[in-house]
Amino acid sequence: MLMPKRVKRRKQFRGSMAGKAMRGNTISHGEYGIVAMESAWIKSNQIEAARIAMTRYIKRGGKVWIKIFPDKPVTTKPAETRMGSGKGSLEYWVAVVKPGRVMFEIAGVAEETAREALRLATHKLPVKCKIVSRADLEGGAGSEN
């Protein structure tokens, strides 16, 4: 699972997911990618499941880039616990994703293979996604999943 090696503070506020992604909204490494269409917290195990789905489909060929990193800690209190007595313990790590964010990229395989691998990965993620190519993002609209 992905998680930071060390953090300045163990527990964080929830924060806001308003607005669009200003950074990470272009395909920088690969030829095809998955773009988020809505805001969400994506857990580290969901990122890992999507990565495994892609790499198993493309087998030995190609390269996959993960463009998001779970750097936000999420805490929970035990079930049937009274309110108060401090913030809960750290449960898992999430990556905050906003609309327009490129989450995964893939290169080195045929277009049909890349699109199918990315389609399998989108089923592992809790957001609506769009599969795009480098030409789609430079030119205009992408293909809908």
Curated annotation (Swiss-Prot):
Transmembrane segments: none annotated. Pfam families: Ribosomal_L16. One of its GO terms (molecular function) is tRNA binding. Gene3D superfamilies: Ribosomal protein L10e/L16. GO terms for biological process: translation. Keywords: Ribonucleoprotein, Ribosomal protein, RNA-binding, rRNA-binding, tRNA-binding. It comes from the Bacteria. GO terms for cellular component: cytosolic large ribosomal subunit. InterPro entries: Ribosomal_uL16, Ribosomal_uL16_bact-type, Ribosomal_uL16_CS, Ribosomal_uL16_dom, Ribosomal_uL16_sf. Belongs to the universal ribosomal protein uL16 family. Part of the 50S ribosomal subunit. Binds 23S rRNA and is also seen to make contacts with the A and possibly P site tRNAs. This is Large ribosomal subunit protein uL16. The gene is rplP.
